[in-house]
Amino acid sequence: GFTGQFSLGHAGFMSIGAYTCALITMRIPTIWGFLLGILAAIILSGIAGLVVGLPTLRLRGDYLAIATLGFAEIIRIIFVNLEITNGAAGLSGIPQFVNWPWMFFFTAGTVLLISNFIKSTHGRACISIREDEIASETMGVATTRYKVTAFIVGSCFAGMAGALYASYFYVVKPDLFGFMKSIDILIILVF
């Protein structure tokens, strides 16, 4: 990401967002229920990002990647064993509210928010942490705070992506958010 942290846990955040939005949308099958589901998905993924980010961002490089991958697998196993998520069978019959115009709207909004963030003072602080963390800390940048904030923002966007995924494909299963989903996200970032 922008702070140079290598995370493989975004499949876990995406699954939190997908299940949250699916459960709310199935109970309230209206556009307002869908929007509430997206908001709840973003908030719950952000809380999970805070819970995971505080202890794991002391790690660096491969160790951070392994710890966040472990988080994603723990979340997947929890969803396999929960009754409310219908276990390994997952949830089906999710009302579809997402189509291409919705996807375009959320993608354009995400690009706009992130590009404005990068150009801001806080975005430049995150980029300086990625380039040289020791120099950033010497210049007075609160590196831990910015790393945790960037991790939370990333988890919120992953939760939103999961919510859109659930509404677009009608089905959410724990197998959809396994190790390979994290690798898919990594491949998309690299290429």
Model-assigned labels for residue ranges:
Residues 1-191:
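Transmembrane alpha-helices and adjacent helix-loop boundaries
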